[in-house]
Amino acid sequence: MLQRDNSGASTSRRLLFIVRGAADVDNIAPVIWACSREQRPVVVVMTSSRAKQLVTTTPWITEATNITLIESLTDDEPRSLRTRLRRLLHHRAAARRLLTRYAVGLLCVEWGELPRRESGPILMRVRRWLLNDVVSQLKYAAQDLGLPLVAVPHGHSTKTVMIRSEHVERIMAHNSGKLPFADRDAYDAYVFASAYHRDAILAQSTMVGGNAKVWGSARFNDLWVPRLYAQASTWTPPDTARGRRIALFFVPKWNNLVNRQATLELMAEIARSAVLHLVIRGHARESDSGLSSDEYRSLQATGNATIVSGAMSSASLISGCDVLVDIDSSIAFDAVILEKPYVRPRYLQDASVTTIWDDLGGAHQTDSASATIGLLESARLTVAPRDLSFADVVFGGRGHEVLDRYQKELWSLVDGPASNHSASTTASE
């Protein structure tokens, strides 16, 4: 088990971050970076092989002298016997010992449920005590020790309403028309990237929201995005793209009220264009936004489509494309920050879904396939205009302000309300 302790003999209370996979690393990494800039000790627990691979190949993390890395792989193949046996090593008492050993003063995780205090039959409680995943065990242990728990955003949202997909409707139908998020009220802080996303969640859930905080987006801002893209590997387009405008199309999450057939037809039209080359990228959660084997073969048969998956990062692909085509992913914010043209074929999503693009601009929104193709093929494709308030409303302000806010708010929770601690090194340095 990897366990690198760079904290030396320091007795300072520490922030502990948990990263479960690629999405967690993407969204929590900027918070870790901001908080570690103070040179106070930070602990990062990795619970999957993918998280470990990403964290241990990030230079600024591996070179930091105040970041301790701990490997607790209980999220790989969760139903396998090997994983179940491994979880026995991370039972509740072991989780408490870990928090005590590293003098943890606060536990920071991505959004998610907060397990309630133990209830139910004794055998069920014993099973949870022994076999729960390490994230749940650490959350329970933090509650046992009276440590603050903070949930930071899982990405961001382009939507100003909650999408009422079939899955969401089923859950709400069993909970008096609301999403059952009341357990989120038990966090010391449940952080949102924007006020409009907070309002959408609170309006449709049982969460009261007294602990709901808007700190801005650590992942999407004008400080972190350029830093992230500067570290991305170079993606080389195929020879078939030479002399053509490269249109990068992110496959949407189909359950977000997206017209799948019309989306595939638009992809095929782009691939048939004489001046465009289609590059398709699936979402990080492939089961939500993948292509079937038949769809894959049909697009490949055009001879003018490149389908990318696996290790190639979204940052590398966006850097290498000429225009981004996307329906509702927050990855479009990267294009806006990088001043790259972004086209949103809004006709592909149900009209009930309203977005920040409708309110503040930033996207070329089209209402038909022909209008989309016409725009993509236009001789001069520029960045869509946006309201002057866009960065403040969507990202929470300038990047150095946002990351400094995360740093100060989290350390203040560690130090307690009576602390006069102030940052000696800001996140903007």
Identify the role of each PLM range:
Residues R4-A22, E110-E113, L248-V251:
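Nucleotide-activated donor-dependent transferases that construct or modify glycoconjugates
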Residues A94, R285-F333, I337-L338, Y342, ...:
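Donor nucleotide-activated moiety binding/catalytic core segment of transferases
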Residues L16-R227:
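Active-site and donor-binding regions of nucleotide-sugar-utilizing enzymes
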Residues L2-R4, I373-E429:
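C-terminal amphipathic helix plus adjacent low-complexity
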Residues V208-G209, V214, S330-G397:
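Catalytic binding pocket for nucleotide-activated donors in carbohydrate/polymer assembly enzymes
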Residues A22-V25, A51, E113-R117, K253-V258, ...:
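Short acidic, S/G/P-rich loop/turn micro-motifs used as interaction or catalytic elements
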Residues N27, W33-S36, A218-Y296:
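Conserved catalytic-core segment of nucleotide-activated headgroup transferases in glycan assembly
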